[in-house]
Amino acid sequence: MRLSTSALVLGAASSAVAFDQKVLGDLKKPAIDLDLSSWLNFGEEITAEAKAVWEEVSMLAPDAVEAFKKQVIGTKPKKANRRPDNHWDHVVKGADVQSIWVDKNNEKHRKVGGRLDNYNLRAKKVDPSKLGVDKVKQYSGYLDDEEQDKHLFYWFFESRNDPENDPVVLWLNGGPGCSSLTGLFLELGPASINKKIEIVNNPWSWNNNASVIFLDQPVNVGYSYSGGSVSNTVAAGKDIYALLTLFFHQFPEYAKQDFHIAGESYAGHYIPVFANEILSHEDRNINLKSVLIGNGLTDGYTQYEYYRPMACGEGGYPSVLSESECQSMDNALPRCQSLIKGCYESGSAWSCVPASIYCNNAMMGPYQRTGRNVYDIRGNCEDSSNLCYSGLGYIAEYLNRQDVQDALGAEVSSYDSCNMDINRNFLFAGDWMQPYHQVVPNLLEKIPVLIYAGDADFICNWLGNQAWTNKLEWPGHKDFKNADIKNLKVEGKEYGKIKTSGNFTFMQIYGAGHMVPMDQPEASSDFFNRWLGGEWF
């Protein structure tokens, strides 16, 4: 996840769009309706606090607000050159899969539910010897939404161990707008890229005992592209369901395995909705067994309360702010939470956008202005041009090589680790502060949920993640809140704490920032394998 204090205020109007957003409760309806005329009467739809924030932005950037009123500014489409179907080893037509019927309880049913006729899946076998990322079987390709001109890129790695029986995991990075190939090469995939742009094997890769799909989503992220854009989590969920359905149809040898979704950061938004979308289809070929969210943003109302404690010495690391700065964050919290509450209650972008603008500036701004790494409170940014990490630059250089793009079938003209247009689109669609934690109880009725957090992260810190899991209202709330906290160990060495009850588990991982598998590879491999093995559920 990347946040820019100045961009949030001064870029507000120039990047914004006028939205009428549906209330979250109905996840089957499109979340967004464009309505430019709504600017004229939006003051009747939002709280006085939210309106005041809009007025503050108007004073800071009047020209930008005028531009906001007049036009919708969307994501610039990526330049792409679609490869012909004969380039691919497999082309799966969603309409064909949608038309398959089977007998069930003496009645005819579609084999898999959901609308698929606008989707197609393309796949090619990747020659491991060409790239040297791993020796295992690999596929890459695109999910195409032909109706919406959306094309999502994925890269699949088979398990190094027992692919016929090991589970399958979908990995999602956050942002919103950051490529999941970051997770592949910087965190948990079979290899990393060094400063010489060379492949380096990762002995702690998550595909040691699981097959892993790395997906660039939403569109216009990484190798994915579109003539349009996606600016809300619910819409993106339909694409994920289609991708998995068509992938498992083409490769049924993986469909019989257990399936899990894992991710970090803004995936705290994505994963509850994506899992809920999958579970909503009774007839499906996706054997979803659990979800894992690392250092996620899921419940803004609760989590934003813990930026001040984390920055001011209450999260296990020394304070990085002065007393007066800490006090100013305390003073700002009531207004921040009031704005978020208004967003939760209305679901309207007119309420949710001011909440994001005000809270990000008031609760994150003081920390950001120190120059410290928002993803790791232990130090400063090593590379401000690459979200604090030089490794992102190495990855981008590698993935922009023509031989790499040809080997994978990539169709875009360039690769970027993060697309900040997407980040702004989600923000100004009101998606940022939506209460996606309210979807989690529905998941807990059906599957286990793991929330893990590196304890040195600031931006989605462990204090906030611990707090929202303790506060979440679900039938097992009391038992979970009162559950014993136990040590996590590998090879006799303690690396964290765990609390688990029923289908809900929370982990605090020591000495790790926002990207736990990067900072603590052995520890993350340990809890990942134990989780997939069902130790805590």
Swiss-Prot record:
A single GO molecular function term of this UniProt record: serine-type carboxypeptidase activity
BP GO terms, sorted: proteolysis
Top EC class for this record: hydrolase
Keyword Glycoprotein: yes
Keyword Glycoprotein attributed: yes
Propeptide, chain numbering: 18-124
Any matching Pfam family: Carbpep_Y_N
Localization of this protein: Vacuole
Keywords: Carboxypeptidase, Disulfide bond, Glycoprotein, Hydrolase, Protease, Signal, Vacuole, Zymogen
One Gene Ontology cellular component: fungal-type vacuole
Cystine pairs: C178-C418, C312-C326, C336-C359, C343-C352, C381-C388
Glycosylation sites: N209, N503
Active site (UniProt): S265, D457, H514
Catalytic activity: Release of a C-terminal amino acid with broad specificity
Source taxon at top rank: Eukaryota
Signal peptide range: 1-17
EC number from the UniProt entry: 3.4.16.5
Family in the record: Belongs to the peptidase S10 family.
Functional note: Vacuolar carboxypeptidase involved in degradation of small peptides. Digests preferentially peptides containing an aliphatic or hydrophobic residue in P1' position, as well as methionine, leucine or phenylalanine in P1 position of ester substrate.
Name of the protein in its database record: Carboxypeptidase Y homolog A
Recorded name of the encoding gene: CPYA
